[in-house]
Structure formats: C-alpha cells, structure tokens
Amino acid sequence: MSDTPLTFAPKTPLQEFWFYFKQNRGALIGLIFILIVALISILAPYIAPFDPTEQNRTALLLPPAWYEGGNPAYLLGTDDIGRDILSRIIYGTRISVFAGFIIVLLSCAFGTSLGLISGYYGGVLDTIIIRLIDIMLAIPNLLLTIVVVSILEPSLANATLAIAVVSIPSYVRLTRAAMMNEKNRDYVTSSKVAGAGILRLMFIVILPNCLAPLIVQMTMGISNAILELATLGFLGIGAKPPTPELGTMLSEARGFMQAANWLVTIPGLVILSLVLAFNLMGDGLRDALDPKLKQ
C-alpha cells in the first residue's frame, strides 16, 4: 500500500479573506448587526407600526411597554406630541445609514481621484493638493462641517454634503501614499510598455492594488458620518423636524431628560450601537486585508 501525499487546494482570495475575518468575533457581531439594520432599513415602510410623523394626542409621553403605564401598541413609548418612538427609530436608523453610505461614496470618489492624480503626477500639482489637504486637516472636522453647513443653509442634504467634503482629506492621503508606493513597480511599467493610457494606469491597473486600506477607511468613515450627522442634527443644523433623524430626536428630547428619559436613552443607544458595529467590522476588515497583520 503506497502512501499518497495529501494535497490541499489553495484558498481563493475570498476564502482567505473570510478565514481571517471570521477569527475576529467582534467583527462578526458587527457584521451581523449591520446586516440586520440594513434589512430593517429596507423594510421600514412595512415593519414600522406607525407613520413616524403621525401624532396621537391621546398618547403623549407614554413610557416603553415594559414600564408601568406603558402601552403594548407603543413598544418604545411615545414623545411629547404622541409620535411612536419605535417607528421614528426605524426610520431614523434608515436615514442615518443611507446618509452614511452616501457620504462615504462621495468623499471616497473625490478623495481617491485626487489622491491618484497627486501621487501619479507629483511635482507642483502634488504640492498644491497636499497643502490644501493639510489646511483642511488643520481645522477640527466638526468646526469645518458647521462652517460648510452654515454657508450652504442647514438641511439634511447640505449636512450630508458638508460631511462628505470634510471627509475627503483622509482618502486623498491614503490613496496618494498607496499610489506613490505602487507606481514604480514592475507590473505598472509593463502596462506602460503595453500602451496603457494614464487613466487606465491609475484607475484599472494601480487602484485595485490600493483598495485594502480604502475599504477599511470607508467602513470607519460610515461610523464617523453617522456620528457627525447625529451631532449636526442635535445642534439644529442638520435634519429639521419632523424628520425622524436620530440626532434631531435627541435635540427634541433635551427638555424631557428627567420626566421621560427614554426619549434620550433609546436614540442614544441606537447611535452608539451603529457606530460600534461599523468600528468593529472595520477592525475585522483591517485584520483580514492587511498582510502584515496576517503574519
């Protein structure tokens, strides 16, 4: 009987990624939570028990159903004008997550393009772009966001745009560093010899090799965007009432922290959970995508 050596098929990149990602329990919990939130956000019109702006003047400041005096029809209670908190939380989460994705897509698209151009060409153009980025980074994010929103006029759309603009520098610096590291490698030189144009070199040849840090930054960027959007809503320069946005809900509940603490506690816990989930998933993505950490 001859001994035949065992052979194992090499893992595909996706299998290898999942192998390292699932080692991080926190990242798995974050991913599951985010998937549940995404599903709830998509199905919000069908699972929310009430319209988030509907007022019931006979059910003002009802506590959650498990409190004394609570009503099972209003599982998380009602606010000072009789709106269902659960419905507003569902729609508020939907707005926050959707806005977070829009912010990250906009900032990543512009930031990555600028970073690729800056890193590829270098010289005076690189110096100008980096000096502008340094100026933006020298100003605290929240302060710069407030300035941009004030210029544009406070609203949910303008708050989203302002946060996207302020988030651009991190993507520029990441992409520029990756471009400068990659542009002189052999595969890029081979593509040049084969006749690849500048746009093809930047966006098709080099960019895919710069994606790992960008994916991690995008995940962390969503959590930052959700937190900043809630902050602007709380300050009164984000979403306007009666829009069921989490920060706006906190702002409206400030006067009831003693009499109806659930109006502050529930939206606050939702914001905390969303930010924590995206951060945990970002940590897992970093561990799975960074070759140094794998070693």
Curated annotation (Swiss-Prot):
Q: Mind listing the GO molecular function terms for this protein?
A: dipeptide transmembrane transporter activity
Tell me which positions the record assigns to the signal sequence.
none
Q: Does the keyword Cell membrane apply?
A: yes
Q: SUPFAM superfamilies under this entry? A: MetI-like
GO terms (BP aspect): protein transport
Give compartment(s): Cell inner membrane
Keywords recorded for this protein, A-Z = Cell inner membrane, Cell membrane, Membrane, Peptide transport, Protein transport, Transmembrane, Transmembrane helix, Transport
The way this protein sits in the membrane is described as:
Multi-pass membrane protein
Transport keyword on record: yes
Source organism, top-level taxon = Bacteria
Q: Which residues form the ABC transmembrane type-1 domain?
A: 93-282
Q: List the disulfide bonds.
A: none
Q: Supply the PROSITE patterns for this chain.
A: ABC_TM1
Predominant subcellular localization, coarse grouping: membrane
Q: Which residues are listed as membrane-spanning?
A: 27-47, 97-117, 132-152, 156-178, 202-222, 226-246, 262-282
Identify the GO cellular component terms for this protein. Answer: plasma membrane
Q: What does it do?
A: Part of the ABC transporter DppBCDF involved in dipeptide transport. Responsible for the translocation of the substrate across the membrane.
What family, per the record? Belongs to the binding-protein-dependent transport system permease family. OppBC subfamily.
Question: Which protein are we looking at?
Answer: Dipeptide transport system permease protein DppC
Q: What species is this protein from?
A: Haemophilus influenzae (strain ATCC 51907 / DSM 11121 / KW20 / Rd)
What broad taxonomic lineage does this protein's source fall under?
A: Bacteria, Pseudomonadati, Pseudomonadota, Gammaproteobacteria, Pasteurellales
- In the UniProt record, what gene is named as encoding this protein? dppC
